[in-house]
Amino acid sequence: MGNCLSSSDQKEAKDRSVAIDKQIEEDSRKFKKECKILLLGSGESGKSTIVKQMKIIHQNGYTKDELLLYRLTVIKNLVDSAQAMVLALRKFKMEPEMPENRENVDAILQYRVDADPGATLDHAMARKVDSLWKDPIVPAIMERSSEFYLMDSAAYFFDNVNRIGQSDYVPNENDVLRARSKTTGISETRFNMGQLSIHLFDVGGQRSERKKWIHCFEAVTSIIFCVALSEYDQVLLEESGQNRMAESLVLFESVVNSRWFLRTSVILFLNKIDIFKQKIPKQPLSKYFPEYSGGPDINKAAKYILWRFTQTNRARLSIYPHLTQATDTSNIRLVFAAVKETILTNALKDSGIL
């Protein structure tokens, strides 16, 4: 059958097509949409750190008064970590090699942080913690860090203990990014990314908090799901016998196959890649996931963990993975440039523009 359209009809059709394409481009440029992003993941996966990065990147960072609000948390994190080290020494029946540290450990264990927000770390205690951290026995303890709970930022705080111990100590943004306090309930952060008005909801990661997530589930544009790659050899804070990575897999499976998220894209942050790189040569992934056969190769190990997560996606949602280091502002800035494109595309589809 011949072509029934005249040359003038064809030109008109082509012009109309070009006009439609231009209109779509114009609509996209003018497009302004509120996007609801749900930030999910198990406890200590880095969700709250991502929220802090959004404040630094998109909300002009922290004022001095806001930084001071984190001073007590930083001091508590430091002291808790030092006490965890002392308890680990006793658990493994080890003793410090430096004589002064054999006396320091009792003082560290008995030290209590003043609950007053204006409290500072005692100078003498700061020196004791610094001395313990420099003790030759410490590497032997750290080799067994998967056998006791020690927060990821412990080494960072120990390295900065003398600065933190100053009477006029004001946390900097790096301190704030590493400060850890349990997230309870639901917090909302609002910021703009280009033509997108983002409403980012951070929900508590601990088990007791998960029943509250239901309130956030309606009309979600995207989910950002955080997984700490470094947790493959760790146990849950809530239940010492449960592997953290296995728990994250169960949680991810329940999220991606939920009836609430049938049309939602999932942005998967494989977080704490820096700690993962340090840990893989020392703690074989195959010890915890026997079917893994890639050895200490960081890329193979990360790909295997990604594969484990994507295998749970029976609902066949679109999953966009990113390797992240939530404490590194430049890394998160780059990652969110890519995330913005994903969210924008989904928002345009939801609005019928694409």
From Swiss-Prot:
Q: Where is this region: G1 motif?
A: 36-49
Q: Where are the transmembrane segments?
A: none
Note down the stretches annotated as region G4 motif.
267-274
Question: Record's superkingdom?
Answer: Eukaryota
Q: Name one GO biological process term.
A: response to pheromone
Q: Name one GO cellular component term.
A: heterotrimeric G-protein complex
Is-annotated flag, keyword GTP-binding? yes
**Residue span(s) of domain G-alpha:** 33-354
Q: Listed GO molecular functions?
A: G protein-coupled receptor binding; G-protein beta/gamma-subunit complex binding; GTP binding; GTPase activity; metal ion binding
Annotated residues that bind Mg(2+) are located at: S48, T183
Location of region: G3 motif: 198-207
Write out the ranges of the annotated region (G5 motif).
Answer: 324-329
Query: Quick one: where's region G2 motif?
Result: 175-183
Identify where the record puts lipid attachment of type S-palmitoyl cysteine: C4
Q: Name the protein family.
A: Belongs to the G-alpha family.
Q: How does it assemble?
A: G proteins are composed of 3 units; alpha, beta and gamma. The alpha chain contains the guanine nucleotide binding site.
Q: What does this protein do?
A: Guanine nucleotide-binding proteins (G proteins) are involved as modulators or transducers in various transmembrane signaling systems. GPA3 plays an active role in transmission of the pheromone signal.
**Name of the protein in question:** Guanine nucleotide-binding protein alpha-3 subunit
Annotated organism of origin? Mycosarcoma maydis
